[in-house]
Amino acid sequence: MIFGVGTDILELARIQETYNRFGEHFVHRILMEEEREQFRRSKWPVRYLAMHFAAKEATVKAMGTGFSHGMWIRDVGIVNNDWGRPEIIWSGRGQDVCDQLGIGGGHVSLSDDAGLILAFAVLMQA
C-alpha cells in the first residue's frame, strides 16, 4: 500500500547560484557520503546537486514530515544503482523516523528539461 506521494520542482539556475556561492560547503551540507562519491564522478555536478535536492524534497513531502520532526536533508539520500535507477537510502536517524511512521521503502523518479528539475517520490507502507 502507498504511504504517501511527494513532488518537487526547481530551477537549475537556483542551485547553480548556490553552488557558485558556497561550493564544497553546499555539497557537504546537502549530500550524504554515498551521494558525494557519485557526485565526484558526475559529468554535470550542478545538475546532480539539483536533482538530488529535488528528490530529497519530494521524499520528505511523501513522508509528511518535510525537513522537520527528526528529519534533516542528509537523513535521506538518492543513489543510482548499476542500471542508473535512482534509489532512496536513509541515514540511521532517517530509518528510525521511517520505522516510527511505518514506511517500508519507496521509489523516486527524476526528470529535467529547459532548466527545470522535477522529482516525484512514492513511499510504501511497511
Please place each PLM-identified region on the residue numbering.
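Core catalytic alpha/beta fold that binds nucleotide/phospho-ligands
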Residues: M1-A126
